[in-house]
Amino acid sequence: MPTSDDDLLIGVESGKYDIGTKGIWKTPAREKKYIFPKNNIGASVIGVTIRSEDANTIKNLDDFAKAGKKLVPIAPQNAQYQVVTDYNAAHLDHPIDLEASENFEIADAYSWVLEGRYDGYFSIELAYQKNVTAKDAPYGQFKDKLTYFRYKALPTYALVNKKETKLAEEVDQALGELKKEGKIAELEKKYFGEELDLLLDKQ
């Protein structure tokens, strides 16, 4: 059943749904509310959209942070907020200025970066590709003015209601079998052009 991110999270927590899948990452807050099977489903590559004119000097997140660049604000309940928080905890000498905000339109984020109001937009690579670089992308008019660099890949999981321990075990077992058979790697290559799980090993 297709649903929004918020409905999935609230629905699985409340018991409306037993399980949900939507590119979910682990966070300490989520681990208190849900069961995460040990085996991940796949991975999401995350990084930063920046102005093309900055691409020669900003090639990674360290460059971005050390240059004192500003990220488009992130909602605290968004898992990406936790990723930047973790980065800052590990890089106390050059943390990223992390501003909390409520949700906003994606078009605003790209416009703010182009205007210079902010210097980067932290997002999933697949979203950048769909929104900016793909054929007939909704913000394709920005593709010559924006570029993207990867930060890291994060494992994504099925999300299971706290009471559904048996279901979580069955899902975990099934995912383990699919991994051993190479089915997940096969699907990643088909839909993403590469085996995303391999990127996790490089972190």
Give residue ranges: language-model regions:
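Extracytoplasmic small-molecule ligand-binding "clamshell" domains
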Residues: 1-24
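Hydrophobic residues within well-ordered alpha-helices
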Residues: 12-13, 48, 64, 112-114, ...
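A ligand-binding cleft/hinge motif common to bilobed small-molecule-binding domains
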Residues: 13, 21-32, 82-86, 114, ...
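Extracytoplasmic ligand-binding site segments that recognize negatively charged/polar headgroups
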Residues: 41, 47-49, 72-87, 125
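Periplasmic-binding protein-like
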Residues: 42-47, 79-83, 136-172, 175-192, 194-203
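Flexible hinge/capping segments at coil-to-helix
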Residues: 51-71
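Ligand-binding cleft/hinge of the Venus flytrap
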Residues: 78-103, 110, 132-138
